[in-house]
Amino acid sequence: MVRIGIIGGTGLENPDILKSPSEIVIPTPYGETSSPLLTGTIRGKDIVILSRHGRNHTIPPGQVNNRANIYALQDAGCTHIIATTACGSLRNEIGRGDIVIPDQFIDFTHHRISTFFEEFRPGKLQHCAMPDPFNKD
C-alpha cells in the first residue's frame, strides 16, 4: 500500500487540504519532529504531512531536525516522500509558481548532522550512493 509523506516548507505550515485529518506525534531516537504529523487522505490517497519549519514557522532551516522528521515519516508507514520548498531560480524561464522536479542536486548544507549512520565499527560502515539521488519511479 502506498502512503505518501509530504514535508511542507514555507506556506504549508497549517494545511487544510486533507480529508478526515488527524494529528499524531511519533517519538524518535533523534528528538522531536518539526511538527506533529497530520494524517488523512487527498483524492483517496493516504497522506501524512509534516511542517518542516513548524506550525508557527519558528524553526530556521539550519535547525530543522531532518533525521527526526524522516524517521517519523518512515515509522508512520510512508512509502514515498514529496518535499516542497520555496526557493528562487537562476533561469528566467522558471518563474514564480512553477513546479520543478529535480533529478540531481548539490548539497551546500554545513554544520548539520547529515547521516543516520554514526557508528564506524568494522562491517557496519554505511555509504549512500548519490549518483542518482531521486527515485525515478
What do these predicted regions represent?
Residues 1-130:
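Metabolite-binding pocket within alpha/beta catalytic cores that recognizes anionic/polar moieties
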